[in-house]
């Protein structure tokens, strides 16, 4: 919106031409989302508390978590509102990728909102059934995947890029692309949701990864940089850096309220949406394998749940004291802050390793 206004008046005020730079708008998007979240956050927390939109805590979980019962949840709505407003303000609204990412993010956010609403307002601990949740996640992911593959103009837009190797790409075809896109979006969405079990645990890795994806998006959308770094050039993908900047800014502000001891939880409305956002951006800029590296904490948390369930069903024994993995370490004696910060450190190292793929080819 502001970009269009700047372009309209650029002939009279040449200084406005600076808004054509994606890098500047990415920084401004991050700052805008940060400020919106900081301003709106306290009021939202007061409203959630007044309406008793509180988190239920599982009885079989770590006993230290019982004090969290009643903490306001559904705070992820704050993140989504900040991202949406900021993206509409600073991104190029004629760019189709901007709308694809926004629609996907808000679509998954709506699924999470219904789930949270049923849990909190209707006092239904199960919320939206797993089958219904997966159905709607699948519907959105498949529709988005079909749109992307059927409107692709370049082979690079539908190939699997292998990082750390020059010009190594695997053609996926329509079926392969749709399948991979489905698993990346739905998988990342649910992985972030599973990880969101401790104060600040999920949001900081999300901020780190979205910041890295902003760099990948900018490079992918820049023909010269993409060629120099051996990355596929995806026309118009650079504009996603603005969205990623907004996500990082909103997420960082949310961490202010979500840090231990948390004043608010993001709930499924935030976790499912943010995971889907990371997933769809990853797909568009063709960095699925790099995302697997950078999101290593999310991957391991998800695998811990899968292994725990499989082990118990097959041999009647549990591999971990409790799943997801962060609860296992809590029961081993780690303090909540220790688990969170150590997982942050691991994510930071993985993100830096993922970013190194830009040059190490």
Swiss-Prot record:
Record-linked PROSITE patterns: MRAY_1, MRAY_2
Top-rank taxon: Bacteria
GO cellular component, one term: plasma membrane
Enzyme Commission number, as recorded: 2.7.8.13
Keywords, comma-separated and alphabetical: Cell cycle, Cell division, Cell inner membrane, Cell membrane, Cell shape, Cell wall biogenesis/degradation, Magnesium, Membrane, Metal-binding, Peptidoglycan synthesis, Transferase, Transmembrane, Transmembrane helix
Main location group: membrane
Pathway recorded for this protein: Cell wall biogenesis; peptidoglycan biosynthesis
InterPro entries: Glycosyl_transferase_4, PNAcMuramoyl-5peptid_Trfase, PNAcMuramoyl-5peptid_Trfase_CS
Protein's cellular compartments: Cell inner membrane
GO MF term set: metal ion binding; phospho-N-acetylmuramoyl-pentapeptide-transferase activity; UDP-N-acetylmuramoyl-L-alanyl-D-glutamyl-meso-2,6-diaminopimelyl-D-alanyl-D-alanine:undecaprenyl-phosphate transferase activity
PANTHER family in alphabetical order: PHOSPHO-N-ACETYLMURAMOYL-PENTAPEPTIDE-TRANSFERASE, PHOSPHO-N-ACETYLMURAMOYL-PENTAPEPTIDE-TRANSFERASE HOMOLOG
Stated family: Belongs to the glycosyltransferase 4 family. MraY subfamily.
Functional description taken from the UniProt entry: Catalyzes the initial step of the lipid cycle reactions in the biosynthesis of the cell wall peptidoglycan: transfers peptidoglycan precursor phospho-MurNAc-pentapeptide from UDP-MurNAc-pentapeptide onto the lipid carrier undecaprenyl phosphate, yielding undecaprenyl-pyrophosphoryl-MurNAc-pentapeptide, known as lipid I.
HAMAP family the record matches: MraY
Protein name as it appears in the record: Phospho-N-acetylmuramoyl-pentapeptide-transferase
Source taxonomy: Bacteria, Pseudomonadati, Pseudomonadota, Betaproteobacteria, Nitrosomonadales
Recorded name of the encoding gene: mraY
């Amino acid at each position: 919106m502001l970009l269009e206004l700047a372009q309209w008046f650029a002939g009279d005020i040449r200084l406005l031409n600076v808004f054509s730079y994606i890098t500047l708008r990415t920084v401004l998007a991050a700052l805008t989302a940060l400020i919106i979240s900081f301003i709106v956050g306290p009021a939202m927390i007061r409203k959630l508390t007044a309406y008793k939109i509180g988190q239920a805590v599982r009885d079989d979980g770590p006993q230290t978590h019982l004090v969290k019962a009643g903490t306001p949840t559904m705070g992820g709505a704050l993140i989504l509102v900040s991202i949406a407003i900021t993206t509409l303000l600073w991104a190029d609204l004629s760019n189709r990728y901007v709308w694809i990412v926004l629609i996907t993010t808000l679509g998954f956010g709506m699924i999470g909102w219904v789930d949270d609403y049923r849990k909190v307002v209707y006092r239904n601990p199960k919320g939206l059934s797993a089958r219904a949740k997966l159905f709607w996640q699948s519907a959105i992911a498949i529709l988005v995947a079909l749109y992307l593959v059927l409107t692709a103009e370049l082979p690079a837009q539908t190939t699997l890029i292998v990082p750390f190797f020059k010009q190594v790409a695997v053609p996926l075809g329509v079926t392969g692309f749709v399948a991979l896109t489905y698993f990346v979006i739905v998988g990342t969405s649910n992985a972030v949701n599973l990880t969101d079990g401790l104060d600040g645990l999920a949001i900081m890795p999300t901020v780190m990864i979205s910041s890295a994806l902003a760099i990948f998006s900018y490079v992918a959308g820049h023909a010269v940089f993409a060629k120099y770094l051996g990355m596929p050039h995806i026309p118009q993908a650079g504009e996603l850096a603005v969205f990623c900047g907004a996500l990082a800014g909103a997420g960082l502000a949310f961490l202010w309220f979500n840090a231990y001891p948390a004043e608010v939880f993001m709930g499924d409305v935030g976790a499912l949406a943010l995971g889907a956002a990371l997933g769809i951006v990853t797909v568009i800029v063709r960095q699925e394998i790099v995302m697997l590296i950078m999101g290593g904490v999310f991957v391991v948390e998800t695998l811990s749940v899968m292994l725990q369930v499989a082990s118990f069903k097959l041999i009647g024994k549990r591999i971990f004291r409790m799943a997801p993995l962060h609860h296992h370490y809590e029961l081993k004696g780690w303090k909540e802050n220790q688990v969170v910060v150590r997982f942050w450190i691991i994510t930071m190292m993985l993100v830096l390793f993922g970013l190194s793929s830009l040059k190490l080819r």
